[in-house]
Design a protein with these regions (language model features):
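Flexible cytoplasmic inter-helical loops of multi-pass small-molecule transporters
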Residues: 48-70
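Helix-to-loop junctions at the C-terminal end of transmembrane segments
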Residues: 128-140, 224
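Structural signature of the two symmetry-related core transmembrane helices
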Residues: 143-157
């Protein structure tokens, strides 16, 4: 449940910043970089309110050695989940990059309107966070597969959309599934990895997320060699997401 609330808080911030970027466009594209100033607010709040006990820096050598030991099966589990997280984040970032151009190409709206669509896509993550506890109870280990496939379908709906409202519907479906899928990755880690090893395992999953975001421009460039059509780009991304979800879920089932 706390993982769900964390996901909700994340998307609130992301949607507010996306909306702010859309409004800052009126002052020129360079003004949009002011959105990064929000990081300074986060830093100040972190320094003021997050407790840091000095005793934590003096952990026993025994605990440190124990925390360093991840078994082969654990490493495989973490690797598969990190790959899944990388593709989830990569495709989501690609959507953020490509929805504005797709809407302009299709005549559905301009860059400012696309920022509203992206904000709606992210705000639905609040509902995803609230409902995560129920969904994980209902689908259990199949939730990653269900959410990943749904995320891919959302992207394909965007690609085939005949109107703005269908783009909005596909974006909302994709945004909901994205939040659920990414939260499920960390839930599976916390469920299957011992508490003393959880920090290390989580750091690998976060590395997967960061890798996915950083690889997005290269992935889009690679797709650009295949097609320059915006709709086809979303179909490729959606298919990739579905295939990855099926593969990762299959590998996780074998490891269970």
């Amino acid at each position: 449940q706390m993982l769900g609330f964390r996901g909700s808080a994340e998307v609130v911030g992301a949607s507010i910043l996306t909306l702010a970027v859309g409004q800052l466009l009126a002052f020129g594209w360079t003004a949009t970089f002011l959105a990064y100033a929000a990081g300074l607010v986060v830093l100040v709040l972190f320094l003021l309110f997050v407790p840091y006990g000095k005793g934590e820096a003096h952990e026993s050598k025994q605990k440190t050695e124990e925390a360093a030991k991840l078994t082969r099966s654990m490493l495989q589990l973490i690797f598969f989940l990190a790959i899944g997280a990388a593709v989830i984040v990569c495709t989501n970032t690609a959507i953020t990059f490509r929805i504005p151009s797709l809407m302009i190409e299709a005549g559905f709206g301009d860059a400012q309107l696309s920022s509203l669509v992206l904000s709606a896509m992210q705000l639905i993550g609040i509902l995803a966070g609230i409902s995560f506890s129920y969904l994980i109870s209902a689908f259990k280990e199949k939730l990653l597969l269900v959410a990943g496939v749904t995320f891919g379908i959302g992207q394909i709906i965007i690609a085939l959309a005949p109107s703005l409202w269908v783009v909005v519907a596909g974006s909302i479906l994709g945004g909901f599934a994205y939040s659920i899928a990414l939260t499920t990755v960390f839930q599976l880690i916390s469920e299957r990895i011992p508490a003393k090893l959880l920090n290390k395992a989580t750091s690998y999953a976060v590395l997967g997320c960061s890798s996915g975001a950083s690889l997005t421009p290269f992935v889009l460039s690679g797709i650009g060699f295949i097609t320059t059509d915006g709709r086809m780009t979303f179909i490729i991304l959606g298919t990739w997401m579905i295939a990855t979800s099926v593969l990762v879920s299959f590998l996780l089932k074998k490891e269970a």
